Amino acid sequence: MELAELEQALRRVPGSRGGWELEQLRPEGRGPTTADTPSWSSLGGPKHQEMSFLEQGESRSWPSRAVTTSSERSHGDQGNKASRWTRQEDVEEGGPPGPREGPQSRPVAESTGQEATFPKATPLAQAAPLAEVDNPPTERDILPSDCAASASDSNTDHLDLGIEFSASAASGDELGLVEEKPAPCPSPEVLLPRLGWDDELQKPGAQVYMHFMQEHTCYDAMATSSKLVIFDTMLEIKKAFFALVANGVRAAPLWDSKKQSFVGMLTITDFILVLHRYYRSPLVQIYEIEEHKIETWREIYLQGCFKPLVSISPNDSLFEAVYALIKNRIHRLPVLDPVSGAVLHILTHKRLLKFLHIFGTLLPRPSFLYRTIQDLGIGTFRDLAVVLETAPILTALDIFVDRRVSALPVVNETGQVVGLYSRFDVIHLAAQQTYNHLDMNVGEALRQRTLCLEGVLSCQPHETLGEVIDRIVREQVHRLVLVDETQHLLGVVSLSDILQALVLSPAGIDALGA
């Protein structure tokens, strides 16, 4: 079957909006559809081909109003999908949610009267609420407690391994086991000051992306169909981590059948915490922990201090989604049906920036897109978390836990960047059953890994913000490493840094520094 026929068939399948019944359909051996997206860095210049995880369609028009009737949704008619641009993104790694901030902490930006002219998305509350969406999942949707996932059967060659890195604090910790202490790694000196960003925010048009995200809802950014893996809390930890690898996902919502609700997320961070806590323990062997159930893990290590799952409604704005992701230091934001409580979709930094990148070409271009990274000072340049290539893997785990970051630039003795070690590299220790060899140095681990990971994509201080955004979206990565001409590390520009600058800073909100 041709790709176009598969995509058409996908839109006709009932129940795809809820995300419970469908997995992403893609012909064997073929990647995501390419899409022509105008470059932010060269207005009116030639278009470049992108390997996009979002299906944009033939025309680049504004996302239509998010209006669908109950009848249309129940019959699986996806013709009125808000923007018709979306294909399920490759699933990314995410840290577990932190404490929910609650409605009182949601940011409210003042209108300046300089809003860009674009159509508003009708809130679902005024159109068709999602009450008709399927109720919480059935047995076939959830991996039951007796489900087994074999590492030898795990096929991970297709995984998208981009992981967001923010050197300030990239991930919250649901389990609450992280203690702040100095990381045993070198840290470059400050090389770039923050110079012109505050001035740019005072110029007309600086709030165009902020207003755009305020006027569109999470429903607009939801995939037509998506792959969603859900774990029952009675599943054994070992089987759960193997299932993450086997299904090519980095996080899964946790369903508590006793409470009949979602109670959290299981992520690669949890696997790192298990290794970090018990690798050197003289009392407990790691294989004993493998037999624990997820429920037991949560009860023992949360010690009754359960934090609410950070989530968002499809009626909420994309502005609120950006704020929730950055404020709570999480990588995945579940979109929950406000009536049934079912998980409809999971939003990520990468998906939100892709949405903004596609339709941002139809908006007036702010002048700050033409300014250089060095002038604007967007990114992290102080106290960077890095790891020496000669350091053992256990040292990298220490840094992941202590600094709460999701990827580490790997440097040699002279400070040159030679690689990137991410949290997702750690989960493959489970897939290869080599997590008892954490004394191997990071450089050797990078040479032995079987997958072609995201790699080290870099930028230089003289490049403009528009060029940096184009490269991140085109390469589908979560950060660019800022280097000089000799490949010495200067800083890191992450998705959080960019979304903070484009969406939150114009509203006077600093979620990264909060």
Swiss-Prot record:
Keywords: ATP-binding, CBS domain, Disease variant, Fatty acid biosynthesis, Fatty acid metabolism, Glycoprotein, Lipid biosynthesis, Lipid metabolism, Nucleotide-binding, Phosphoprotein, Repeat
Record carries keyword Phosphoprotein: yes
Binding site for AMP 2: R250, K350, S422, R423, F424, D425, R449, L457, H478, R479
Binding positions for ADP 1 per the UniProt entry: M265, L266, T267, I268, T269, D270, V310, H331, R332
Signal peptide extent: none
Distribution of this protein across tissues and organs: Muscle.
Molecular function per GO: AMP binding; ATP binding; protein kinase binding; protein kinase regulator activity
Composition-biased stretches (Polar residues): 59-71
Binding site for ADP 2: R250, K350, S422, R423, F424, D425, R449, L457, H478, R479
Job description of the protein: AMP/ATP-binding subunit of AMP-activated protein kinase (AMPK), an energy sensor protein kinase that plays a key role in regulating cellular energy metabolism. In response to reduction of intracellular ATP levels, AMPK activates energy-producing pathways and inhibits energy-consuming processes: inhibits protein, carbohydrate and lipid biosynthesis, as well as cell growth and proliferation. AMPK acts via direct phosphorylation of metabolic enzymes, and by longer-term effects via phosphorylation of transcription regulators.
Disease link: Defects in PRKAG3 are the cause of the RN- phenotype which is associated with excess glycogen content (about 70%) in skeletal muscle. This mutation originated in the hampshire breed pigs and has beneficial effects on meat content but detrimental effects on processing yield.
Name of the protein described by the UniProt record: 5'-AMP-activated protein kinase subunit gamma-3
Species of origin: Sus scrofa
Lineage of the organism: Eukaryota, Metazoa, Chordata, Craniata, Vertebrata
